[in-house]
């Protein structure tokens, strides 16, 4: 039995594009690695001062915390602190990074596999320490993910590509993927798309011709700008259709634009 722990930096995930994240799917993602979840911690900020003054705000925040708890996550709440900087401005701060790192290190003795939910590069040393102790560490994040952190983990899951992790805004059937092959001479590419929650649940045969792609900002599509989608690992959103030969292709493709909170 592979014993797993989940450690989610909620503030980072929500702030960087994970608003509306389905916590049940996070658990399913770990279970798809043939692991049994022993620990599931969600680290969140709590602004007690504001909640005391704003009943509406308090109600919404409590409903959100209750929803996370219903998915069997243990909540670790970090109180928001307020202080004045040198210019007299009031600054708010609630950083749960240290709490998450300490808990992960202490609880890792009884775990084989850890899913870290954050794009914060400050967790680089935590990941390396856990790996040096023989643990497999995977990463789940959205936008603004530290490249150093992403390269250090054993497997990286982009939250935008995990099926069902985020709610569909308009119940659209559009897919998301990344370009992994580009033929500049013939102007086509192949996209890789997640088909499930397992590490290898990926199909990489989705054909995309440059003529089926449009930049979201309206600028002309060139070989160079099309190729940059691969080098910059941009997420591409598209409709998937079956060709007459039974293969699949992407049409009405464009850059995916996440909704930031």
PLM feature spans:
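OB-fold/S1-family single-stranded nucleic acid-binding modules
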Residues: 241-261
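A short macromolecule-binding patch
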Residues: 198-217, 252
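C-terminal helix of von Willebrand factor
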Residues: 151-175
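Short nucleic-acid-contacting surface segments enriched for D/E, G, S/T with interspersed K/R
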Residues: 213-237
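Structural detector for short beta-strands of small beta-barrel domains
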Residues: 171-187
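Active-site histidine-anchored catalytic micro-motif
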Residues: 110-144
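Domain-level signal for Mg2+-assisted phosphodiester chemistry and nucleotide/NA-binding surfaces
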Residues: 1-93, 121, 136, 144
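Short aromatic-glycine-enriched beta-strand elements
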Residues: 185-194, 204, 251
